[in-house]
């Protein structure tokens, strides 16, 4: 028998197969760099001329970025629509204040909306940088930064094995 949840997934014959989002920050940590690649697959027998668009909405539902492209999608072939933009003054994501934007991707065939896919996006930048401060061995410390701010990891180093007998 079936022991876990089951659901049916249905998509149009020409639909989003996959997408990739890169949402980071520039060197000032104030301007968002947004890149989106949408892969489409056409399972129909004839080519389609589709309009692919995205809209990035803030927490109040206001569009901060939007763009659309026409794309000719051949049968049985993956086609990719790529978008890239800079967004000044974005609200950054941190663990303490996890600001997220709602991205809505839309596929249209003429005036008919074929598919709408929502996704949440946060703008943040992770880095490892060396400091000017030197450790006891004379090498500089390396610091983990989120949006240019140092993050201190607190924890322990656990090794669940015994050097003489293997696992405990």
PLM regions with names:
Residues 1-168:
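Secreted/periplasmic carbohydrate-active enzymes, especially glycoside hydrolases
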């Amino acid at each position: 028998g079936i022991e876990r949840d089951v659901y049916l997934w249905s998509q149009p014959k020409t639909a989003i197969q996959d997408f990739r989002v890169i949402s980071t920050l520039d060197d000032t940590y104030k301007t968002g760099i947004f890149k989106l690649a949408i892969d489409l697959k056409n399972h129909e027998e004839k080519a389609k001329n589709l309009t692919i668009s995205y809209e990035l909405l803030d927490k109040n539902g206001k569009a901060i970025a939007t763009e659309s492209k026409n794309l000719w999608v051949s049968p049985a072939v993956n086609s990719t629509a790529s978008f890239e933009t800079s967004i000044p003054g974005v609200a950054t994501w941190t663990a303490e204040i996890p600001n997220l934007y709602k991205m809505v991707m839309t596929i249209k065939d003429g005036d008919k909306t074929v598919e709408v896919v929502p996704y949440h996006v946060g703008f943040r930048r992770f880095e490892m940088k060396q400091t000017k401060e030197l450790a006891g061995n004379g090498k500089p410390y390396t610091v983990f930064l989120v949006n240019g701010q140092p993050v201190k990891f607190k924890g322990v180093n656990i090794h669940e094995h015994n050097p003489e007998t293997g696992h405990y």
